[in-house]
Design a protein with these regions (language model features):
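Surface-exposed, low-hydrophobicity beta-strand/loop segments enriched in small/polar/acidic residues
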Residues: 1-175
Length: 175
C-alpha cells in the first residue's frame, strides 16, 4: 500500500526540435510522466513544477496535463488541435508560463518556475493579484501510473531556438 504522505520529484525530458519555433507552435507533443500516481488508476496532487533549460532562450506557453496519450501535433508545427483530439486527451489541468517574468538565469541556461500567477486586478487600479496555481489533481487511466503533458507556445516570447535535449520538466507530486 502506498504511503498517503509519499512525495516524489519526477524529471522528464520532452522531445523538442533543434529549429526556431514560432507563435502558436507545439513546443512538445504528448510526453509521459511516469509514476505520476502511486498506484494504477489512482490520483495524485501536482504541487510544484519548473522547466530547466540549457538554453538562455525565453519563451511563453501553456503546459497541459492529460490523462491519455493523445497526439496534439508534431513538435515545432503550428497547433491545429481538433475538438475531438482535445477531448480525447482528457485534460486535467494547465499551467501558463510568462518566460520573461517567471525565469531565473544560471550560467548558460534558465529555470522557468510556475509558483505563482500574477495578474493585474483592474485596468486602472494598478493592483496585482497573486493567483494560486497548485495543486492540480493528476488522475491516471485504469492500468497505468502515468499521466501525460504537452506544451504550446503562446504569448509574446514565442520564438525560441533550442537544441534537442535542452528542456527538462521537474514536477513535484504528492500521492
Amino acid at each position: 500500500m502506498m504511503n498517503q504522505n509519499a512525495r516524489r520529484v519526477i524529471r522528464v525530458v520532452p522531445v523538442i526540435t533543434a529549429d526556431a519555433y514560432a507563435d502558436n507552435d507545439v513546443l512538445f507533443n504528448n510526453t509521459e510522466i511516469p509514476l505520476a500516481v502511486g498506484k494504477s488508476g489512482e490520483c495524485s496532487k501536482l504541487v510544484s513544477a519548473m522547466i530547466i533549460s540549457k538554453s538562455t532562450q525565453v519563451f511563453d506557453g501553456e503546459l497541459f496535463f492529460c490523462q491519455t496519450t493523445q497526439s496534439v501535433g508534431a513538435a515545432n508545427s503550428a497547433r491545429n488541435i481538433s475538438d475531438a483530439d482535445f477531448a480525447a486527451a482528457k485534460v486535467l489541468g494547465r499551467l501558463t508560463l510568462d518566460g520573461s517574468a517567471d525565469d531565473y538565469t544560471y550560467g548558460g541556461g534558465k529555470i522557468f518556475r510556475f509558483d505563482v500567477n500574477l495578474e493585474g486586478a483592474g485596468a486602472t487600479d494598478g493592483d496585482v493579484i497573486a493567483k494560486q496555481r497548485f495543486p492540480i489533481l493528476l488522475q491516471a487511466a485504469t492500468g497505468t501510473t502515468s499521466v501525460f503533458c504537452f506544451m504550446l507556445l503562446s504569448g509574446t516570447d514565442v520564438t525560441p531556438n533550442m537544441s534537442v535535449g535542452d528542456l527538462e520538466l521537474v514536477l513535484g507530486v504528492e500521492y
